[in-house]
């Protein structure tokens, strides 16, 4: 199975849980996350503007309401816009609230393609994975072709237990 095929299978696996909601730009309108959400019910898709801080903030709120959010960040370059929500809200709410609140989300983050067409330039292909590991205290997983579905399965288990996970995809692998 191709890398993209595995991503699609992983999204279908997540969607089998009725509490899962996919959040992001292009998840419902304009491509359904590059086709990887084609078989997911519209009722599980929440389309947002290109506003990464909003996406993660929305995910935090949905998690507190008992849902299981999966945020699609189409280019890692723009995760920087979401760091306030990731570090100071999603990542710190449990400590700030003395364990009263424990929001969690899956962050699906894509590094843009550098070696395959369409090269989208230096502002759409940066990899901040190592830097993010220095400031985010939940697991960050770089997806390999042979483990895409299993890594998303583990992320869903962690999510159900109240732990966030960031999964990093490489568009060049598609």
Which ranges hold each PLM region?
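Thiamine diphosphate
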Residues: 1-174
């Amino acid at each position: 199975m191709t890398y993209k095929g595995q991503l699609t299978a992983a999204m279908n696996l997540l969607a089998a849980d009725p509490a899962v909601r996919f959040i992001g730009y292009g998840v419902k309108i304009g491509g359904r996350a590059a086709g990887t959400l084609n078989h997911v019910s519209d009722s599980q898709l929440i389309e947002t503007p290109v506003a990464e801080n909003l996406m993660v903030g929305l995910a935090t709120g949905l998690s507190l309401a008992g849902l299981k959010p999966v945020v699609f960040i189409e280019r890692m370059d723009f995760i920087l816009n979401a760091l306030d929500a990731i570090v100071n809200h999603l990542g710190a709410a449990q400590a700030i609230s003395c364990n009263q609140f424990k929001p969690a989300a899956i962050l699906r983050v894509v590094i843009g393609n550098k070696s395959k067409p369409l090269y989208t330039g230096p502002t759409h292909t940066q990899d901040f994975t190592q830097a993010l590991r220095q400031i985010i205290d939940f697991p960050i997983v770089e997806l390999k072709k042979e483990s895409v579905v299993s890594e998303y399965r583990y992320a869903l288990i962690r999510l159900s237990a109240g732990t966030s996970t960031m999964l990093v995809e490489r568009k060049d692998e598609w």
